[in-house]
UniProtKB/Swiss-Prot annotation:
This is Isoleucine--tRNA ligase. The lineage of its organism: Bacteria, Pseudomonadati, Pseudomonadota, Gammaproteobacteria, Thiotrichales. It catalyses: tRNA(Ile) + L-isoleucine + ATP = L-isoleucyl-tRNA(Ile) + AMP + diphosphate. GO terms for biological process: isoleucyl-tRNA aminoacylation. Keywords: Aminoacyl-tRNA synthetase, ATP-binding, Cytoplasm, Ligase, Metal-binding, Nucleotide-binding, Protein biosynthesis, Zinc. L-isoleucyl-5'-AMP binds at residue 558. ATP binds at residue 602. It holds the Pfam family zf-FPG_IleRS.
Length: 935
């Protein structure tokens, strides 16, 4: 037996079988850095139509988690796909750098501002800390393969950004949207500050639920209201509350004019309840022998005076539209400084707005009996006092949804304080925002209804904060009238100029006289701006001012929690400052959870860190998992899920390697064969690739990365791996090196690789770079500067062997493979080349298959394939799952060719080559080698 190894075209490529991504990726990153690849992209696509995806700023605090990674990877995939489509698609990363979380970190090391450390030094430390955190996160984002202008990111603490926030505020004031108000706002006692809606989250809390007796002062008036002559016992209005700590601030009781109220006698006193709540309330009190004396309407009760349960204070009964008879007692305790409805009622009736609770959550010195006590701890003492004074009708516990601080996870309180607001009603901001939402594209589509509901119901936006590390609210108000200085806009622009030069410190360290002359009449506001105003201003501070970008953004892409956060604040700032929408399209992705659908938590031990993933499996595995997951809902990740992703990656890599290894020696300048002259199967491969490319580009355009990933995987494993590449192995390895059959296959492979590497590039950025380096090409451009491949062709409309034809051939081949597997299991054959395949076909299928002539065997990867009419079928033939088709498999008895391994009666016909078939002899000895037309 001779050794024919040197006569075969064995596969050869520099593209390795093993990814070894964790080690290779940093080297590829280093190469990109040296090439200045992002700068080259910008230069190459300069002047093209722009596509701007505006980056929502992550908070500069701590290492990135897998949610951050998902967000940046999705953005990177979209940007890279848009670049492939020929857009100038810049990506400028941003960071949120002010606010409480950074203050808390600095406090741990240096103590509170103004106590252990000066406020000026505290801000310097905050700036230093934020800068360090940005560098940590930047390194991680770059390691994920995310391309962007990392050297010039936008930080909300950049001096120019801080200054432009002040200029944005000036526009908002100029447009009439700012208002000052003494209003109840969500207040965190740990933050010592008001919170915006976006900083409030709801969680279950167990609270005391008590029914309190307010004694009616004028019994005769009450009797008259119920149509009675008189009352011979004390009467009480009963309120139900879950916030006993607000009782010191009670100033009124609210009823509804339209509701019916009952007077009920219990032993030696009367109580007042809403008629529809009598039965369930008495049941709650476990009282059975009560007697309903009379019923009246709420409007008859208004004006009657009650007495505070433990203070010498008169409490009027007033009408409130917010009062219902759905729960409680139908009479509502009213503390104007601790609730929105209470406040509205208090303003309407000029009730006392005395503040009883300080910013730290303790009662102020003017709170009799409870001064200095923490409000939530004082509830038990208040309940005890009510019992002593016989004013407690009932006491219970209730588990209910309650507002908590998003940062501290502690319960909030409503607290009326002087604050600055962007008004939702002045200048019709709410209606304008709602109209703009309708004009914006939202995906998933439910995002529109979600943000509409939030904007429709949201209160005025409280933009003032009582913090140290934040952009100032640099206003001057009159010391007596509290009106804004008449030159406010001019002053703000002066402040912005100083901040642009020296940062926010320029305001905090300045004297008032540097900005105004009337310091005797006006004082400066010491508040800072809500950090959501920082990020919400980004469209004004970045998109509207940076000529490299454009306003509005084409796309915002963030987690689904941003309907109440950045999407909303961006909209409100842009609408109030510029009067137009900041974005054309808004996409959201779901949260990352574990394989059981649980949130990531250190306590559960289910945290998957991006650092662990890219240091072990590689960033491309994380990128592939991100792209493969339908990100419109929750995204499950675990070690097991990532292992499956790594398996998928291996299949994709092996396909790329097989393709590249069969391009050894191929010169695209001299060896390309025209489409019409290719072997028919190679024509199919190119046309099929074109069909997939059209679908893939469409999916990329719709940001459907999971569809892209599915299509690429299907293409590699089914169309290529299970069909085309399986069939052409024989031709590639055994045909004459420079003969037409092999060059035809190499031409198809060349086109396929050039398309496939581009499909992969947005997702598998590192691997695509590696593939590109190993690919024969006619350009020196790096893959990042390429556009979608245009060398693919489709079949003409009148093509006889078109995609539909080959789809039917694939079906038939699958059925043949099924029967081959049956015969393998029966030990009739060990491999398909040992099989003699006979297909019995009806007229329709016969016509399909006869077109392939004697090359049918190459498609079926067998040594012999016969086609016969169905009437000649034998009892040993097996019915296919295709109508009009039977298949018979027998073992071929011909000798094996030692070169191509086909069984052939021609083995030994040539005395010089006794152990190979005549086809192999032709490929070794003749100038042209064998010819192929179909496969």
């Amino acid at each position: 037996m001779s050794d024919y190894k040197d006569t075969l075209n064995l596969p050869k490529t520099s593209f390795s079988m093993k990814g070894n991504l964790a080690n290779k990726e940093p080297m590829i990153l280093n190469k990109w850095e040296k090439q200045g690849i992002y700068k080259k992209i910008r230069e190459h696509f300069a002047g093209r139509e722009k596509f701007v995806l505006h980056d929502g700023p992550p908070y500069a605090n701590g290492s990135i988690h897998v949610g951050h990674a998902v967000n940046k990877i999705l953005k990177d995939i979209i940007i890279k796909s848009k670049t492939l489509s020929g857009y100038d698609a810049p990506f400028t990363p941003t960071w949120d750098c002010h606010g409480l979380p950074i203050e808390l970190q600095v406090e741990k090391k240096h103590g509170k501002a103004g106590q252990s450390i000066s406020e000026d030094d505290f801000r310097k430390e905050c700036r230093k800390y934020a800068k360090k955190q940005v560098e940590i996160q930047k390194k991680d984002f770059k390691r994920l393969g995310v391309l962007g202008d990392w050297e010039q990111p936008y930080l909300t603490m950049n001096f120019d950004y801080e200054a432009n926030m002040i200029r944005t505020l000036a526009k908002i004031i100029e447009n009439g949207h700012l208002s000052k108000g003494f209003k109840p706002v969500h207040w965190c006692t740990d933050c010592g500050s008001a919170l915006a809606e976006a900083e409030v989250e709801y969680a279950d809390k167990v609270s005391p639920a008590i029914d309190v007796k307010f004694k009616i002062k004028d019994k005769d008036k009450l009797a008259q209201a119920f149509g009675l002559d008189s009352l011979n016992h004390d009467a009480f209005a009963i309120i139900w509350t879950t916030t006993p700590w607000t009782l010191p601030a009670n100033q009124a009781i609210a009823v509804n004019n339209q509701l019916n109220y009952s007077l009920i006698k219990i032993e030696d006193f009367y109580i007042i309840l809403a008629e529809n709540l009598v039965e369930q309330t008495l049941k709650r009190y476990a009282i059975e022998n009560a007697q309903i004396i009379a019923t009246t309407t709420g409007n008859k009760l208004t004006g009657i005076i009650a007495e505070h349960p433990f203070y010498s204070r008169h409490v009027p009964i007033l009408h409130g539209d917010h009062v219902t008879d759905d729960s409680g007692t139908g009479l509502v305790h009213t503390a104007p400084t601790h609730g929105v409805d209470d406040f509205t009622l208090g303003k309407e009736h000029n009730l006392s707005m005395e503040i009883f609770v300080k910013g730290n959550g303790c009662y102020s010195e003017n709170t009799k009996l409870f001064a200095g006590e923490f409000i939530f701890k004082a509830s038990d003492r208040i309940i005890e006092l009510l019992g002593e004074k016989k004013r407690l009708m009932n006491s219970d516990k209730i588990k209910h949804s309650y507002p908590h601080c998003w940062r501290h996870k502690t319960p909030l309180m409503f607290r009326a304080t002087p604050q600055w607001f962007i008004s939702m009603e002045k200048q019709g901001l709410r209606d304008k925002a709602l109209q703009t939402i309708k004009e914006t594209s939202w995906a998933p589509s439910w995002g529109q209804a979600r943000i509409e509901g939030m904007v429709k119901d949201r209160p005025d936006w409280c933009i003032s904060r009582q913090r140290t590390w934040g952009v100032p609210l640099p206003l001057f108000i009159h010391k007596e009238t509290e009106e804004l200085h008449p030159n406010t806009i001019e002053i703000l622009h002066k402040v912005a100029e100083k901040i642009e030069k020296d940062g926010i410190e320029a305001w905090f360290n300045a004297d008032d006289c540097e900005f105004i002359t009337e310091t005797a009449q006006y004082k400066s506001v010491k508040d800072t701006l809500d950090v959501w105003f920082d990020s919400g201003s980004s469209s004004m501070c970045i998109l509207d001012l940076d000529k490299r970008l454009s306003y509005p953004a084409d796309l915002y892409l963030e987690g689904s929690d941003q309907h109440r956060g950045w999407f909303q604040t961006s909209l409100l700032v842009a609408m109030s400052a510029k009067g137009s929408q900041p974005y054309k399209e808004v996409f959201t992705h779901g949260f990352v959870v574990d394989e059981h659908g649980r949130k990531m938590s250190k306590s559960l031990g289910n945290v998957t860190s991006p650092q662990d993933i890219y240091n072990t499996l590689g960033a491309d595995i994380l990128r592939l998992w991100t792209a493969s997951t339908d990100y419109k809902s929750e995204m499950a990740v675990s070690d097991q899920i990532l292992k499956r992703t790594a398996d998928t990656y291996r299949r994709l890599r092996n396909t790329a390697r097989f393709l590249l290894s069969n391009l050894d020696g191929f010169n695209p300048v001299t060896d390309i064969i025209e489409f019409d002259k290719l072997v028919k199967l190679d024509q199919w491969a190119i046309a099929k690739t074109k069909e997939f490319q059209d679908k893939i580009i469409e999916a990329y355009d719709k940001y459907q990365t999971h569809t892209v990933a599915q299509l690429i995987h299907h293409f590699c494993s089914i169309e290529m791996g299970s069909f085309y590449l399986d069939i052409i192995k024989d031709r590639q390895y055994t045909a004459k090196t420079d003969g037409h059959p092999r060059k035809s296959a190499q031409t198809a492979i060349y086109h396929i690789v050039h398309a496939l590497v581009r499909w992969m590039a947005p997702i598998l950025s590192f691997t695509a770079d590696e593939i590109w380096d190993a690919t024969p090409k006619t350009t020196d451009l790096p893959i990042q500067l390429c556009e979608w491949y245009t060398g693919l062709k489709s079949f003409d409309q009148d093509a006889e062997l078109d995609l539909e034809y080959w789809a039917k051939i694939q079906e038939i081949r699958s059925e043949v493979n099924r029967v081959l597997e049956i015969k393998r299991n029966e030990d009739v054959i060990k491999a398909s080349l040992e099989a003699e395949i006979t297909i019995y076909a009806d007229k329709y299928n016969y016509k399909l298959l006869e077109k392939l002539g004697n090359e049918l065997r190459f498609l079926l990867i067998s040594s012999k394939a016969d086609l016969k009419v169905i009437e000649e079928s034998t009892s040993s033939s097996i019915a296919a799952n295709i109508l009009g088709l039977l298949i018979e498999i027998t073992k071929i008895e011909e000798p094996k060719c030692e070169r191509c391994w086909h069984r052939s009666s021609t083995v030994g016909d040539n005395p010089q080559y006794k152990d190979i078939c005549s086809r192999c002899v032709e490929n070794i000895t003749t100038e042209a080698g064998e010819s192929r037309e179909f496969a």
